[in-house]
Amino acid sequence: MVGLIGQKVGMTQIFDARGCVTPVTVIRVEHNVVVGLKDVERFGYSAVILGTGCMKKSRISKPYAGQFAERIPPVRVMREFRGFTLDVSVGQVLDVRVLESVRYLDVCALSKGKGFQGVVKRWGFSGGRSSHGSKFHREAGSTGQCTSPGRTFKNVKMPGRMGAERVTVQNLRIERIDVGLGVVMVRGAVPGRNKATVFLRTAVKRER
């Protein structure tokens, strides 16, 4: 398994040799620095900690800077990847070329926030009739029973804040890799807004 930290640029479309159009999401992968390594003897599992993004010196506190090794500048985003198959060392810089041998990716990001929404938009409720004397249009309806149990159970679908959740889309095929621009194009949509931080890893279900 290999992983990288990237930034969502946006969506576009590309054409193959047959002239068929394919919608793709462009993800920019800047230099990923190996911040740290974890081994089985000390931590109980093996993992690689990657970081990317520059930080202003005025924004760096001493406790935050203390977790980085010497000659490694503090980075804005860090992520731990377990089961990393590449042999890397602390301070090594990774780029989009590590994905050249990968065919499918799992992409994880924070979805767009929609704010406070009702049950029709949030959960897909059909709602009531629009006419013929109906007084029930977009309401949630009943949320439970009567005297027994006399309460509403947990996890009942109700209005509330929608979005801004961690979402993982699996098995996105890599359509194109541009080493010069440092971008990877994956088939389909990726969660999050443009310029959002996304985490790429080898598709777990494709490795089996």
Curated annotation (Swiss-Prot):
Would the keyword GTP-binding turn up in this protein's UniProt record?
no
Per its UniProt entry, which superkingdom is the organism in? Bacteria
Subunit structure, per the record?
Part of the 50S ribosomal subunit. Forms a cluster with proteins L14 and L19.
Instruction: Answer whether the UniProt record assigns the keyword Ribosomal protein to this protein.
Output: yes
Q: Which NCBIfam families match?
A: L3_bact
Give the signal peptide range. Answer: none
Which residue ranges are recorded for the region named Disordered? Answer: 134-153
Please give an example of a GO cellular component term from this record.
cytosolic large ribosomal subunit
This molecule's function is given as: One of the primary rRNA binding proteins, it binds directly near the 3'-end of the 23S rRNA, where it nucleates assembly of the 50S subunit.
According to its UniProt record, what is one Pfam family this protein matches? Ribosomal_L3
Q: What biological-process GO terms show up in the record?
A: translation
According to its UniProt entry, this protein's organism is Treponema pallidum (strain Nichols)
SUPFAM superfamilies for the chain: Translation proteins
Protein's UniProt name: Large ribosomal subunit protein uL3
* GO MF annotation: an example: structural constituent of ribosome
Q: Which UniProt keywords apply?
A: Ribonucleoprotein, Ribosomal protein, RNA-binding, rRNA-binding
Lineage per the UniProt record: Bacteria, Pseudomonadati, Spirochaetota, Spirochaetia, Spirochaetales
Family, as annotated: Belongs to the universal ribosomal protein uL3 family.
